[in-house]
A protein has these predicted regions:
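C-terminal catalytic histidine-bearing segment of alpha/beta-hydrolase fold enzymes
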Residues: 137-166
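Primarily recognizes the serine-hydrolase "nucleophile elbow" in alpha/beta-hydrolase
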Residues: 48-110
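Acidic beta-to-alpha connecting loop that harbors the catalytic carboxylate
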Residues: 119-122, 150-152
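Short beta-strand/loop motif that positions the catalytic acidic residue
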Residues: 109, 115-117, 121
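Short alpha-helix in the alpha/beta-hydrolase fold that links the catalytic acid
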Residues: 125-135
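Serine-hydrolase catalytic machinery in alpha/beta-hydrolase-like enzymes
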Residues: 1-61, 156-165
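Alpha/beta-hydrolase-fold catalytic nucleophile elbow
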Residues: 16, 69-71, 92-95, 116, ...
Length: 166
């Protein structure tokens, strides 16, 4: 996706949040990797913010609006980054775990938020979407959510379900 964004004329940064170019070999392996990183919310947010600040300091990003876009763990990371007060134009979470957002965090969000999840996702319960709606109610945050019917996890990657079943 990063190459595709660059081809469209954007400056892009792809972040390896697991480290060492690790890719999940199955859904179970992916969930284990996800759990290892996400156990400490403050650490997760600090890491995301550190990457953002380094990216923002690059000459090619000066004067540009920046959005954080991610799939699954990356989507969750985009929402966590928005909660740090990073000056983002937008944060997009595609089939990602949806974090709780406190009132203090909501006050720090400058980004417009877009969350897109599958209604039949076995990994991200629909209750998370409802909870996010409650967390952001009356907060002043510009947010939209799409819950796609009869759609499972990793809907942006049709091969993911096949890879996870091997």
């Amino acid at each position: 996706w990063g190459r595709r964004l660059v081809e469209e004329g954007y400056v892009a940064l792809c972040v390896d949040m697991f480290g060492n170019a690790t890719q999940a070999e199955s859904l179970e392996h992916g969930l284990r990797l996800f759990g290892e990183v996400t156990q400490d919310r403050e650490l997760w947010q600090r890491r995301a913010r550190r990457v953002f600040d380094a990216f923002r300091a690059r000459p090619e990003t000066q004067g540009c609006e920046i959005a954080a876009i991610g799939f699954c763990f990356g989507g969750s990371s985009a929402l966590h980054l928005a909660c740090t007060g990073a000056q983002l134009a937008g944060a997009v979470c595609l089939h990602g775990d949806i974090p709780r957002i406190s009132g203090e965090e909501a006050k720090a969000i400058s980004a417009s938020l877009l969350v897109c999840n599958g209604a039949a996702d076995p990994v991200v319960p629909n209750e998370q979407a409802l909870t996010l709606a409650q967390d952001l109610k009356g907060s002043g945050v510009d947010w939209q959510m799409l819950l796609l019917g009869e759609t499972g996890h990793s809907f942006t990657n049709p091969d993911a379900a096949r890879a996870g079943s091997r």
